[in-house]
Amino acid sequence: MPELCRFFGIIIRMYAEPEAPHHVPHFHAYYQDHVGIYSLDPLELIAGTLPRRQQRLVEAWAELHQAELLADWQLLQRGRRPHPIKPLE
């Protein structure tokens, strides 16, 4: 699963799912032993949990980069490598 970004101890990854077109565009956020899965449109936590502070950071980052996340989703579903996305600073 390609890593798209890393910031404040959070790792953002996205899976290619060419055999599962029924899945909504989404990404995975990892922080220590926690995993949160976020849909892209609408942008919301759909599975898993993150500590509240990290959840707010991921949501702020995803709002800033929603178009890039959607573009990376399309690339992955076509078997192409996604582009890295700038982290929060």
Residue locations for each model-derived region?
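Short, charged/polar N-terminal "headpieces" of proteins
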Residues: 1-23
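Generic secondary-structure boundary/loop-capping signal
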Residues: 1-4, 11, 35-37, 42-43, ...
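Intrinsically disordered, low-complexity boundary segments flanking structured domains
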Residues: 1-2, 25-27, 71-72
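Short connector loops at helix/strand junctions that flank enzyme active sites
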Residues: 7-9, 22-24, 33, 57, ...
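Low-complexity, charged, repeat-rich alpha-helical/coil interaction segments
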Residues: 8, 45-46, 53-57, 67
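A short, structured beta-strand/loop element
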Residues: 15-53
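C-terminal structural segments of small proteins and small subunits
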Residues: 57-89
